[in-house]
């Protein structure tokens, strides 16, 4: 489409990133006798798997990424396709979005708004406040790497899997008596995409590989084993494309031959092949595009070429699992998990499939790790995956819901590092937004409206109905303080404080006194994407603005105290905060969306912006503001449960904050349907936007742990559909790592590790009955108080772990995965011989090893570590396998394996044990043949 046509389509379909296109549901039919394949079992059911290739359907392909590089893997037998992205390939180039006519017309715009002349105000905004250009620029693809492998006939036993525990896509099938296997992963340590092809018959792999792209590109063969694609990003909105990129694909073979000419890579008669894909970009930052993109691509490829496949894989796993393995969750398993993933989605409404909620939760974490790493761009509307030159809403950053939602799970699900790109962006926007603040408002500080892009556009775009919203930068800046509440990192706060202060300063300069109400209000602004009267959204002081600014000004004031600066500014911020309009309850018993008690023309609108105060903020709480709490419930009832995918996901979080477990779980189930999840579990609105995935992960976390109200509230919205389960590794504000195990709908055991000294307040039903609290580090019983019947309070120390439990509950601060079903045969009977036990150590610990389940080609085991006569701070268990067993996954421990020798060290929450205390870790392993002898040299050492 042309730019103008595209913009008109946006407006016709409601312009904001949450606007829904016509739903196009898909179908999948259950397989009789279906069983999960070995790859899914090895992942403890944390895998997406299918018995059919993706064909040409992008929403059936499987995503991999390392934060910077992304690929969609199709898994076709005849032609493998890797659709490639690099996170800095944006249309156009650096531009100044500020409109110099804005400041001179601002007073008249405000007069019209206060006079209820909203249409006339919007007309003047269109003439004088729109950015230059009037739309922002799109995230674009690199292209495709295609491997032509031959005919797809004679294929059986086809399986395609995305293993969330290893971040690897595996395709395997039998063709003409040969077992072919492909593995694809994106390595963050080595900054390449790795495609590994193997066959169980020598000299069976033959293919031709080529690049293609919708961009302006040139293909070539720089050497005898490499092909190249050199290109430049597209033009858009009158801005010339200026991001150069180079993609390289290099083949290393065992057996056979490899050659390259004319942009085609030819492999013939190989037994195994490793294809390395490296991509370089000339994008340096939002102002500079003259980077050595060719040198970057070649340097990364050359470095990866010196590393064998085993080391590439092990480095990738060590990096990825250090993040992913922090959180374990088990919500139970039923036979529904034996169906392919697309079937599970299609039949979810009529099935009991609690494990799918765990899979959905962990998939969101996987996607965030794969699309957002330190030093990369933030995850955009599609994360990092896009195959279109003109993707929906440009696949950029929509700030009035979508970008913040992408990062709601970052801190709560223990992925703090993945949050860093957002703060890099905020610092960039404090520069571009300062230019807009001065030119369009005559103000200091900085401002960003409802969207930004790779060039950090900060002005009003897409028309005033959507774009004339002032508090985008304010919301992003408030995330600085929110992140600090989790981490306690004063240096982080000091580094980002200028951006936080600048966002607040803009509103100190621009808020105006409402002529009749006397409050300080934004003008002009809107309640995101929703008209209050026909075709007009512009107003003064919408409720969401007031809520965001209350958070922003409070955060800026508190941050200035922590870093010890700006006492005068601090006082101004607090005085301004106190003059903001309070939330009001309207005539329908709802939270008013605007200062006036208007009834919205679109009553089931996807945005519920005026409940920002309920979530993600803490301005509306059950115990602190009961009247507003009930009004928030009424607001949600009026808005209804339906909506776009991301809207449903936000509503999970809302209902979790209302502690309504049944309604929150209903919305989790509502999200799992074929018009809201694609076959590859990408969230649909439709079309695909990734924020729904992240919002769902956040919502499930909120159902299990909340920390926004000065306490850790365990299982605040636990549904009856999850009667028994465990979760560990969640994070709470105040610097806590939390685990909880439950049965019959209430906690049996709570484990909390403190990052810093302080007072810990715990709320759970557990405390309404008999319980014990133990300092696990030394076995002592800390003093506790009971300020409420379901609350205990105690003093905690940094680095120590505390356990609360019902009497008689064995110390097991771990999460046990669901027992996997066998792939083809019933499980064998666990060994009747006594478990293997390490030599006793009276003042140390002993380890007991046993097999708990087994199947053809694999087994599940567990090891219990029991402290001796003295408390321990940490433990390490080692053993030697006798039959070529390989550990694929460990929970509640950190493992490595060298040959037959396995080492498992404690996780961060279960190393400290009191005298006589015990903890258990589990694992999944593969085994060649039927012999699975107990290990030798089992030892346990302690610190």
Task: Kindly give the residue locations of the regions a language model identified.
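Carbohydrate-binding surface patches
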Residues: 188-195, 199-200, 735-761, 861, ...
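Extracellular low-complexity, O-glycosylation-prone Ser/Thr/Pro/Gly-rich "stalks"
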Residues: 840-943
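Solvent-exposed beta-hairpin/edge-strand motifs
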Residues: 762-778, 878-891
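N-terminal export signals
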Residues: 2, 8-28
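Ser/Thr/Gly/Pro-rich low-complexity, disordered linker/stalk segments of secreted
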Residues: 810-841
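Surface-exposed beta-strand/loop patches in extracellular or lumenal glycoproteins
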Residues: 205-213, 753-767, 871-882
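Aromatic-residue-lined binding/catalytic grooves and analogous aromatic/hydrophobic interfacial grooves
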Residues: 36-465, 482-484, 515, 562-565, ...
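C-terminal capping/lid segments that line or modulate ligand- or cofactor-binding pockets
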Residues: 61-84, 88, 108, 128-129, ...
